Amino acid sequence: MEAQAHSSTATERKKAENSIGKCPTRTDVSEKAVASSTTSNEDESPGQIYHRERRNAITMQPQSVQGLNKISEEPSTSSDERASLIKKEIHGSLPHLAEPSLPYRGTVFAMDPRNGYMEPHYHPPHLFPAFHPPVPIDARHHEGRYHYDPSPIPPLHVPSALSSSPTYPDLPFIRISPHRNPTAASESPFSPPHPYINPYMDYIRSLHSSPSLSMISAARGLSPTDAPHAGVSPAEYYHQMALLTGQRSPYADILPSAATAGAGAIHMEYLHAMDSTRFPSPRLSARPSRKRTLSISPLSDHSFDLQTMIRTSPNSLVTILNNSRSSSSASGSYGHLSASAISPALSFTYPSAPVSLHMHQQILSRQQSLGSAFGHSPPLIHPAPTFPTQRPIPGIPTVLNPVQVSSGPSESSQSKPTSESAVSSTGDPMHNKRSKIKPDEDLPSPGSRGQQEQPEGTTLVKEEADKDESKQEPEVIYETNCHWEGCTREFDTQDQLVHHINNDHIHGEKKEFVCRWLDCSREQKPFKAQYMLVVHMRRHTGEKPHKCTFEGCTKAYSRLENLKTHLRSHTGEKPYVCEHEGCNKAFSNASDRAKHQNRTHSNEKPYVCKIPGCTKRYTDPSSLRKHVKTVHGPEAHVTKKQRGDMHPRPPPPRDSGSHSQSRSPGRPTQGAFGEQKELSNTTSKREECLQVKTVKAEKPMTSQPSPGGQSSCSSQQSPISNYSNSGLELPLTDGGSVADLSAIDETPIMDSTISTATTALALQARRNPAGTKWMEHIKLERLKQVNGMFPRLNPILPSKAPAVSPLIGNGTQSNNNYSSGGPGTLLPSRSDLSGVDFTVLNTLNRRDSNTSTISSAYLSSRRSSGISPCFSSRRSSEASQAEGRPQNVSVADSYDPISTDASRRSSEASQGDGLPSLLSLTPVQQYRLKAKYAAATGGPPPTPLPHMERLSLKTKMALLGEGRDSGVTLPPVHPPRRCSDGGGHTYRGRHLMPHDALANSVRRASDPVRTVSENMSLARVQRFSSLNSFNPPNLPPSVEKRSLVLQNYTRQESSQPRYFQASPCPPSITENVALEALTMDADANLNDEDLLPDDVVQYLNSQNQTGYGQQLQSGISEDSKVAHEPEDLDLAGLPDSHVGQEYPALEQPCSEGSKTDLPIQWNEVSSGTSDLSSSKLKCGQQRPSAQQPRGFGLYNNMVVHPHNLWKVGTGPAGGYQTLGENSSTYNGPEHFAIHSGDGLGTNGNTFHEQPFKTQQYGSQLNRQPLTSSALDHACGTGIQGSKLKGNSLQENGGLLDFSLSVAPNELAGNTVNGMQTQDQMGQGYIAHQLLSGSMQHQGPSRPGQQVLGQVGATSHINIYQGTESCLPGTQDNSSQPSSMAAIRGYQPCASYGGNRRQAMPRGNLTLQQGQLSDMSQSSRVNSIKMEAQGQSQQLCSTVQNYSGQFYDQTMGFSQQDRKAGSFSLSDANCLLQGNGTENSELLSPGANQVTSTVDSFESHDLEGVQIDFDAIIDDGDHTSLMSGALSPSIIQNLSHSSSRLTTPRASLPFPSLSMGTTNMAIGDMSSLLTSLAEESKFLAVMQ
């Protein structure tokens, strides 16, 4: 070492000598010599150089020279750097050297590691004691092994801790000390101490905001050795430090030049504070703005991964720092690093800053062992702020923590194993108690307020204090006058008041712990213990006896537990570890942990706003407090603290101008109905809570929605319930705080999850109350509007509300069902905000996807961008989409098989996009659905509907099925959002909504937002259409088709043909209900089929495998012309949700099947079964690309998807009938594959045959005998037209150039499992195209032939429209032209029931336009189990078997007619539905794709009747609906309605249906349904 030391360059020596003042006694030590010390463990140059390896720190013991100043500098070298030369300075000399470019590189001279000075270890400090090089921190510090030699003996034991910080190996211990510039050879290594090197300062500054330097603080020259010598007075020292401000050093701007001592303190503090920034060493973060000194928070540190830290170390980040938590107290939590880093020198034996010393001593006293550890070591004078530093500076104490470290071993022990660490030690007693705040407990949940009068709100203080300094505790109050009841004494000081209260009042009433303070929100509710009252009184007096002991930190708390929590912010201790398995996050307080757990691991929102009428719930108390404070006002916030208490009496009315004003004072507090403490301000506050929440209104009825409920701020009784509430008024003037909005949404449903705590808005709200008020006011207004729009609970719509028939849920919150259809004036911009936006769905108490958007109150959703006027939550995206589309106001929970009322999905579904003001379901329908569900599940029957009388006669008729022929048609209710969801329930005039055309389902948050074409948005006016409006505006044909028309319930209300064409989309629940009723009505002899839901029937059929004919519905209304559909609509562009939904699929008339044949609840097959076939897809949804044969480009080719194909080998035994009950012969091309190279109609309405690229089913099938697989391919080959323009097909049925190639033998040769592969879509569409609006609904028996077009390669297939008897269960091979198939683009597969399809002549397919061939097929439900996946698309309207009767809505065929067994073949031919629809509709499957999926015609028929559970079900969560009420249509809906559902989800256990999801509720549907069949029937009858 010595040799190396002497080997230093002459220049360095000279520099050293010069800077030292050339003191002869100074030992020359070369930098290198020192550098070697890093590697050397030896003490060399005995006498002169005491060199002890201390990893990076080498100090050479200078010969004591009085003349020499102690040079405080330790090499802060990076791990790879060598120790710098030790610098000496003569006491008086301050050589001004150029600032070293590398401040952290410096030379190290022998020095006392504790003070860094060369000579007397505790020599009077130099005026500008250079900051000694930081003592490196390493595991030893953390583990308490790092040990400073407490004695001042010359041979200081330099702890060998100078290794670079484990966490910051890259940071050479950057010394703050200005002295160093080893790199600048020309420059003296000794920089004047005062000039802090700019680079270094810059670095520090960056660190200040970024990673805490606490770990590094020691390395920074903050090492314990910095302490001035005892001889130096703190003031002098500070003064010296302060001088720095005058220096050019970067600190100049940091340190207040005004206060020298302060400056010095700040300087030190700055250093330490910054250090603490990252690791919560006791040092307080320099950052004053931080609500909670997240000293531990590495958030700012780019390189530091807080998550990782937390994950790796439940209690602290220290482990990350040194991989050791051995002494959590020592290294303990982040902050404990400081202890390790700081030398014992910290003990203030001398008059260091009194404050810091005092604090420190307190800490030491608390840290009993620590005190001893420090006691002997020379004090490190951390500049105690002589004046309050600009920000609380944990500074000295922070540094003091190192004291713990000081006694290495003792430190470990010292640092409380409790992991409280120094800070905890400071708050040791507190630490032990932490009493009130249960580590895990909700941290007194708002309701639970901590033992200590949480009600006061102080309970949360601790949490707040840490998090939000402003919130530390109740508003700062400094009361000097006694307002105790009957006492008016006044005092000069708060202390006197407190003393008075405690002695005269509290103790005077020993037996009674009641706060009698005037206006106390406790309302004299007694406390359980005196101490609680004492603590409570602090709220009134403002007393905060518990002060943070960290120097520079001025925080004080009225509750000790809050202080303890706060202290953790300094120490970084995180004793509260997430209890969730596998989650290692640790928190400093139970509150944070509870928040984390509630938000991250559950949907629970235990913190309920207790303000009367406010139903907001939060996952964490802080959010609740924030809500209360921002929305209800600071006073409310304080009172709110009472949250645990009985509803606190409304806080004294705040200024009317205050936040509360946003609420209309008069509004009843909806939260506690009985309790409505209508204090106007309280009410207003509640309103402020965000009536928006009302929108979400948990259940308006429920005053406090379950934690999972929308944390709707709206009064517990959702404001909406008060229809009368300001209606649409949107007084922006009210001061609602926006913050509240965020708060409202703040409690995110776990679903999303996540929820950000109160949004920034809330924060801003605090900052800008006026703005927040405005926002809040807007929110409230919107809510009011929404409320006004829809009676929440009030079954009777308030007069001012838009006329919406009240949904009377059986107990469901029907009112929620109402979506405000009216444009919320609130969001005028969102004129289209559908009821969905306001959907009462929220009443479900859960933020369902849709609801959440609403619950966000548009503005508040955390997720939502800022205050997006519409919906904040992720669902807002849905809402946004929804805005354009008619809202389905269906009952949120109207029908959720699994959870009738609760399911989020159901709520969403119910929320579905119904018509803006129309409920998808009438109460009756709801009732019926519920009844069915109850029957299926064995649950209690729903509550009778009280307001049937409210229904219009027509509606009643429709619902009751007073006569299919009555001519009464239910308005096409918009299905809940699902496929049904799509335009299905829209008015005909409405353009496709984006979700309709594009996704067919509301876009989920995860789904990219789809732009909506202008024409797609529903005119606002439409939104207001009342449920009673039976003549909805014309929808684009596609939409019309999609619109849920009672598919089997076709009544043309007026001469105008109903546009109720069997929509490709499955019927909505309403339709299903109506159909069900109609079916019963239509059939005098109600069959079980009639009574049972389609799903049930189909299920039964599938179980029995008895053929259950499906009815082809071809409802083509003149109105539904292609023209209606936006011609520019690019179906190809449509997402998986099928645009094709628009396209109705032909329904085949089904002969009645035995009860067993009945579908399992109408929709069941569709929901659970392979309804999935293209017919399922019929909504026009294209298969997911994966599913779709590539052969179908979008719309390019019709391809029969193999999965659509029927299973081979299934014979008629399955009871499946071939296409049409009567086998239809197909004489034409071997395969009927329609290749739509060209859009129909657009190019002459011809499909151009194109080879399938992916699977050339058509071409190859042509050659292939139809094996069942072939049938699978060939049959049901759908026509895929290129996207069809509205005009593409000529209504007169321009020639479609179908490339029909079906191997006759294939067709005839194989019967699929009774599953018909017909692609309804293809059928419906082709026929539709042919009929394309021109086709008139004509009796099924019409024999006219219509030339569909020339078959491309093949001769035209003439669809012979011979009459075909569709006998129930009849499986004739009657020559039924596979016109249906042809039309559908399916190869007509002869009856699958064992009958081979007979090849039809390729002659021109002719189908008389006016005439839809009604092909009855008694394919069994089992057969229906088509591969949903296989289906490229499901037609939204598939033929549905209803009661074994087929109704051709469009045709207007009566069931009896169809039953008549003999229809002309044309009748037998699949009816083209929605022929009027655009060509694109023809392509319903994927518009282009006609995938032949096994069309269970019965499913189609059923589908017409089917309840659109899918709509009810939220996207993707269809399975829940599957429980028993699933209807095939649902499955279909699933497939097409939900964008998610590229493949229909079938929960039902249909054998062929490969549904990944099975509905738990469904269980064994067959047995259940069988047992419940009668009950269902009964219920249906009752309905």
Curated annotation (Swiss-Prot):
GO terms for cellular component: axoneme; cilium; cytoplasm; GLI-SUFU complex; nuclear speck; nucleolus; nucleoplasm; nucleus. Residues 1-10, 58-78, 448-457, 810-820 have a biased composition (Polar residues). There is a cross-link at residues 773, 779, 784, 800 (Glycyl lysine isopeptide (Lys-Gly) (interchain with G-Cter in ubiquitin)). Coiled coil: none annotated. It holds the Pfam family zf-C2H2_15. The phosphorylated form interacts with BTRC. The full-length GLI3 form (GLI3FL) interacts with SUFU and this interaction regulates the formation of either repressor or activator forms of GLI3. Its association with SUFU is regulated by Hh signaling and dissociation of the SUFU-GLI3 interaction requires the presence of the ciliary motor KIF3A. Interacts with KIF7. The activator form of GLI3 (GLI3A) but not the repressor form (GLI3R) can interact with TRPS1. Interacts with ZIC1. Interacts with ZIC3 (via C2H2-type domains 3, 4 and 5); the interaction enhances its transcriptional activity. A zinc finger (C2H2-type) spans 480-505, 513-540, 546-570, 576-601, 607-632. The modification N-acetylmethionine is found at residue 1. This is Transcriptional activator GLI3. It comes from Mus musculus. The gene is Gli3. It is found in: Nucleus; Cytoplasm; Cell projection, Cilium. Keywords: Acetylation, Activator, Cell projection, Cilium, Cytoplasm, DNA-binding, Isopeptide bond, Metal-binding, Methylation, Nucleus, Phosphoprotein, Repeat, Repressor, Transcription, Transcription regulation, Ubl conjugation, Zinc, Zinc-finger. The modification Phosphoserine is found at residues 664, 849, 865, 877, 907, 980, 1006. The modification Omega-N-methylarginine is found at residue 175. PANTHER family: TRANSCRIPTIONAL ACTIVATOR CUBITUS INTERRUPTUS (PTHR45718), TRANSCRIPTIONAL ACTIVATOR GLI3 (PTHR45718:SF5).
